[in-house]
């Protein structure tokens, strides 16, 4: 058993799933020009479970450690269980992260959830079909969606949060836009705070082509 420090070092020195995307996987990437770090996650699904996961990392050692820890945490999980995961579980698996390394867990969470959203957009939405025991809640991160989620849970039904990303204008205040990266993160935090799975489905390209620039 590794102690907290050695857990981080072990993932850096022997990363699980590095440069090993599963066949027929969907991808989710996070990072880019702002910090120079980039993490891409590849997921494959079988019988409602994550049966394959790998990643690539460009940047600091913490990014490799978070990608590796993500592989261990998510592989074999049911889709809804994976959609409950985030930076908190990653930081715990690595024994905590310093302020300088915490951004790596943020990028790993974002890459994971973009890949999960790509699974749904690619045709796996049937796994979230509404039933008497499950209700999809459109989450914006605001008060109304939070109350709706609580009411559904109070009825005894399983609430699953979904945020549709239709438009993102970097020239506007992201905190005031329902589709901005900040709003998506806020919606995910809300869902996870209520112990709900959360999915973000990125429909910006088809929305732009079909609605904004038809």
Predicted regions located by residue number:
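Domain-level signature for proteins that mediate thiol-based redox and metal-cofactor handling
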Residues: 1-136, 150, 154, 161
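ATP-dependent adenylation/nucleotidyltransferase module used to activate substrates
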Residues: 125-214
């Amino acid at each position: 058993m590794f102690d907290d420090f050695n857990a981080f070092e072990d993932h850096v020195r022997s990363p699980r799933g590095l440069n090993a995307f599963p066949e027929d996987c969907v991808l989710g990437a996070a990072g880019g020009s702002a910090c120079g770090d980039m993490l891409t996650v590849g997921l494959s699904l079988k019988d409602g479970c994550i049966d394959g996961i790998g990643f690539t990392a460009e940047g600091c050692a913490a990014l490799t450690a978070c990608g590796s820890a993500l592989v261990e945490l998510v592989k074999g999980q049911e889709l809804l269980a994976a959609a409950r995961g985030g930076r908190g579980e990653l930081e715990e698996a690595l024994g905590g992260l310093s302020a300088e390394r915490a951004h790596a867990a943020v990028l790993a969470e974002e890459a994971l959830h973009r890949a999960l959203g790509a699974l749904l957009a690619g045709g796996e939405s049937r796994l979230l079909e509404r039933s008497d025991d499950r209700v999809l809640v459109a989450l914006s991160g605001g008060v109304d969606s939070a109350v709706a989620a609580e009411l559904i849970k109070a009825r005894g039904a399983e609430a699953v949060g979904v945020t549709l990303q239709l438009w993102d204008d970097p020239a506007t205040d992201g905190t005031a836009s329902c589709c901005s990266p900040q709003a998506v993160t806020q919606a995910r935090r809300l869902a996870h705070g209520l112990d709900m799975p959360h999915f973000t489905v990125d429909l910006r390209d088809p929305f732009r082509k079909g609605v904004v620039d038809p």
